[in-house]
């Protein structure tokens, strides 16, 4: 159960290149960019602008229209935009750093990085090894004679399994870790198994399972694939939808171990837990159950399904996870599925996949090498200035709020004062020295890393929460708010142009990185984050009247987004306002507060906001395949980029003042329909 709120969706499909690396320190600057005396501050990037589109009608296409019309999406990408522009730029730096590692000493971080990279690059060896890397795990599955035996094996496998087990921070005691269980066990989004609009995805998945079963040596491959697909359909039917799973009230169900077992008495809990971890049983005396009704259904499905089908299910889950790193036939089968579900036409270059493997599995090891070279410690202080200005603007907003009563205002300001700001990279790094990465053995090395991470996670039980730990690597082009540590986190990689530029005018930095910072702070006060106090604990600090007022604003914003349909899609493919409301609230607050911080910085109540809004529009430049857009609409808690730009500004008086927006303009929103926070 994650408590983190990233700025953009992180779990991009695995065939895409992992996000970026860290920029040079020179990309950082004070918020007003006045430290460059040799040339005037740079304005917003207008190279993609379409002046035929009025900002009053469509700010997103006014800023990006020419680029959207002329840019051709590369055949190996599902999307490209400002975030991928930055990540592509720094991805090459990751490659260069890895290439600079020559004959590293055995057991060093450099050896781990280089050998993992080289193992991914050696496709001939991967093809030659065939199924050998998984043979030991297959033998364990086949050796399980009974369901209790198989439950123990399932717990030990590097998979989510039927019921997922993880470690989370206790929402009611943010200094303690708790084990958590919840829904798991699918190869696709649960919606793809039943909704008619995803029928082609289901067909492609069925084909993939058949090819994996054949390539994996399963007897009766087509029959095995169909039986596993039917099983996954049953599991998917028990899933909570993604609106319900983001409700932190509904997903916090603290149970004793006996109560957990009583939820699903048919499931073999004891052997499953012993396979999952060797930690003492008493550490599992209390467990958070995220989706209790799913657990109950999972127990029934476990009992009703023949053990032979479960064996095939686990084998196909392993093959699905590692197919792209095995024989050419299995890798090709995996990519054929990706082509259908994501709309890409060709694979990325092999080196990009290899960089992604290193970044995705040894990201902190790689990140430490990067920040040592490109991001000196003093750079944190320079970025902190802008954060401080945003916090000051938030404080002013709460103090002057017309809809919050004094007790709620005071509590909000108190929480704001306790926010921890983390910039660039962690102060201490995870020690991966005990992980064995073996040259020429990619899958075995990945299994070793996965086992290490699982053990590291389980070892947190019984220890105080480490609130200095990061949930992203420094080379990640993103940012996030963590609710149980009440922290905002800005990896080094996002602190560069076009998000943050030392040579840019203040308006540009406030419209770009300023709004990003405001967004992350805003998550502490969105529909879910507002349920926690400054120490990261669940606490109701709102008066009933203020809570009702906030709920009304939230419902109003949900209604605004529910009617939005991305360009080129049918009317039925509209934004899910309830799913995206947390991010929409953070987007709205983020830009609203950044506008206020801009005023504070310039010491005027009436600055020229034009360049700030243009920079805001540039933030959300993005082009996607239709398949990827459809997938995100169904699954992502973020709205499509065009609405993250346009719908936010429709609620802001500064936008109306700056561009003279009036009734009849397409972005005009009646005063009584606007949401003010």
Pin down the residues of each PLM region.
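N-terminal secretory signal peptides
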Residues: 1-10, 17-28
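Short, solvent-exposed loop/turn elements at domain surfaces
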Residues: 67-71, 188, 498
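Intrinsically disordered, low-complexity linker/terminal regions across diverse proteins
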Residues: 87, 266, 288, 292, ...
């Amino acid at each position: 159960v994650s408590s983190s709120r990233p700025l953009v969706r992180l779990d991009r499909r695995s065939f895409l290149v992992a996000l970026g690396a860290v920029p040079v320190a020179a990309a950082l600057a004070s918020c007003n960019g006045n430290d460059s005396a040799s040339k005037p501050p740079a304005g917003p990037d207008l190279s993609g602008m379409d002046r035929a589109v009025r900002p009053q009608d469509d700010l997103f296409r006014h800023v990006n229209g020419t680029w959207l019309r002329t840019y051709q999406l590369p055949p190996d990408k599902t999307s490209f935009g400002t975030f991928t522009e930055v990540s592509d730029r720094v991805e090459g730096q990751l490659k260069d750093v890895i290439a600079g590692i020559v004959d590293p000493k055995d057991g060093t971080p450099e050896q781990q990085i280089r050998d993992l990279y080289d193992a991914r690059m050696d496709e001939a060896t991967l093809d030659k090894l065939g199924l050998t890397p998984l043979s030991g795990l297959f033998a364990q599955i086949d050796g399980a004679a009974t369901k209790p035996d198989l439950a123990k094996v399932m717990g030990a496998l590097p998979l989510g399994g039927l019921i997922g087990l993880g470690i989370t921070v206790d929402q009611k005691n943010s200094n303690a870790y708790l084990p958590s269980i919840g829904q798991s066990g699918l190869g696709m989004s649960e919606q793809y198994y039943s909704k008619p609009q995803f029928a082609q995805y289901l067909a492609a998945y069925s084909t993939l399972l058949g090819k994996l079963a054949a390539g994996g040596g399963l007897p009766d491959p087509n029959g095995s694939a169909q039986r596993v697909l039917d099983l996954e359909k049953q599991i998917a039917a028990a899933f909570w939808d993604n609106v319900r799973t983001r409700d932190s009230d509904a997903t916090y169900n603290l149970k004793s171990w006996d109560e957990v077992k009583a939820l699903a008495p048919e499931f073999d809990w004891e052997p499953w837990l012993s396979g999952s971890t060797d930690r003492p049983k008493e550490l599992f005396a209390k467990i958070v159950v995220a989706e209790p009704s799913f657990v109950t259904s999972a127990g029934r499905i476990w009992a009703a399904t023949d053990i032979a089908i479960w064996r095939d299910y686990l084998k196909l889950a392993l093959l699905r996870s590692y197919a792209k790193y095995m024989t050419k036939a299995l890798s090709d089968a995996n990519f054929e599925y990706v082509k259908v579900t994501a709309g890409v036409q060709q694979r990325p270059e092999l080196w990009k996949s290899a960089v992604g493997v290193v970044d995705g599995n040894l990201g902190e090891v790689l990140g430490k090498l990067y920040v040592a070279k490109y991001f000196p410690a003093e750079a944190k202080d320079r970025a902190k200035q802008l954060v401080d200005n945003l916090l000051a603007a938030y404080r002013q907003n709460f103090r002057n709020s017309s809809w919050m009563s004094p007790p709620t205002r005071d509590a909000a300001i108190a929480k704001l004062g306790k926010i921890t700001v983390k910039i660039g990279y962690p102060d201490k790094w995870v020690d991966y020295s005990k992980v064995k990465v073996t040259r020429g053995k990619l899958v075995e090395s990945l299994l070793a890393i996965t086992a290490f991470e699982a053990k590291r996670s389980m070892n947190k039980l019984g220890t105080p929460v480490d609130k200095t730990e990061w949930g992203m690597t420094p080379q990640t082009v993103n940012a996030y708010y963590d609710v149980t540590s009440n922290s905002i986190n800005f990896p080094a990689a996002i602190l560069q142009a076009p998000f943050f530029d030392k040579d840019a005018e203040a308006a540009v930095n406030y419209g770009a990185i300023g709004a990003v910072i405001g967004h992350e702070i805003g998550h502490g006060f969105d529909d879910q984050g507002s349920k926690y106090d400054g120490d990261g604990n669940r606490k109701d600090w709102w008066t009933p009247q203020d809570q009702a007022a906030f709920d009304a604003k939230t419902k109003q914003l949900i209604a605004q987004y529910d009617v939005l349909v991305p360009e080129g899609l049918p009317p039925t493919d509209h934004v899910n306002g309830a799913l995206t409301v947390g991010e929409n609230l953070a987007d709205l607050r983020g830009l609203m507060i950044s506008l206020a911080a801009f005023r504070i910085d310039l010491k005027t109540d009436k600055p020229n906001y034009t360049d700030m809004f243009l920079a805001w529009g540039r933030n959300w430049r993005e082009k996607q395949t239709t398949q990827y857009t459809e997938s995100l609409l169904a699954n992502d808690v973020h709205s499509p980029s065009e609405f993250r730009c346009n719908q936010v500004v429709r609620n802001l008086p500064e936008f109306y003042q700056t561009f003279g927006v009036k009734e009849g303009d397409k972005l005009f929103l009646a005063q009584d329909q606007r949401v003010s926070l």
